[in-house]
Each structure stands twice: as C-alpha cells, then as structure tokens.
Amino acid sequence: MKNFALAILVVTFVVAVFGNTNLDPPTRPTRLRREAEPEAEPGNNRPVYIPQPRPPHPRLRREAEPEAEPGNNRPVYIPQPRPPHPRLRREAEPEAEPGNNRPVYIPQPRPPHPRLRREAEPEAEPGNNRPVYIPQPRPPHPRI
C-alpha cells in the first residue's frame, strides 16, 4: 500500500514538472493592464441609443395620492387602534370585594448584607479611651 501511494506521488510530481513540453514563449503577449478603447473619429459619430429612465418601483417611493375632489368624498375605513399587549402595559388589578378579603403573605424585608452596608461603629465611652495610633502623613512624591 505504501508503494502504491508513493508511486502516485511520483507520477504526480513528474507530470507537474515535465508536463509542459511547450517551452516556446507565447506568441501573443499577455495584457496585464486593460488599455483604453481608441477614440471614435469625429466624422464617425452615429447616434447612440440611450434608454429612458425607469420609473421608481411603487413599493420603494410612492408619490402622494392626489387630493380627492370635494364632491367625490367617500368614507374611508380607519381601523380601531389596537389594545396594548398585556405584558407590555397592565392596568391595575380590580379591587377585591370586602367580603372576599383574605390576608396576603408579605415577607419581611431582608436585612442588608453585612459587607454591603455597615452601620457606624458605636462611640467609645469617655472613660474607656485608649490611645489610637495615627500614622504620620506621607511626604509628597518627588516626581510630583
């Protein structure tokens, strides 16, 4: 199997390298850049067909409809406005009847998390004052 695959590779390489037996340069040079068409002579000016501009597509740009004449006014159907979607705007729920009032469970508010909001430390009593270390202010940075 290895020999068969190797033979295929060798044949492919030989065909790729030695397959082009025509070593002569091409007779017609390849045009790399497109050259301009030669200018038409002034005496050879014949009329050129220029088509009319196409009208705009009716769905892309519509002109305003012409005003109706006063005597030709007929009623136009105007649909009712749609109600708002129930999930977008809810009206207040109707009040319950007094005889049907039953207690509703309202949970107590949760205390704030201790790391999020701490109350101030309680003031020390005047008789229990001990000295507190207050560091010296740092000198300004030399580059500032």
UniProtKB/Swiss-Prot annotation:
Residues 20-144 are annotated as: Disordered. GO terms for cellular component: extracellular region. Residues 134-144 have a biased composition (Pro residues). Apidaecins have bactericidal activity; predominantly against Gram-negative bacteria. They seem to interfere with cell propagation. Residues 20-42, 63-70, 91-98, 119-126 form a propeptide. It comes from the Eukaryota. This is Apidaecins type 22. The keyword Secreted applies. One of its GO terms (biological process) is defense response to bacterium. The keyword Repeat applies. Belongs to the apidaecin family. It holds the Pfam family Apidaecin. Its main location: secreted. Keywords: Antibiotic, Antimicrobial, Cleavage on pair of basic residues, Immunity, Innate immunity, Repeat, Secreted, Signal. Residues 1-19 form the signal peptide. It is found in: Secreted.
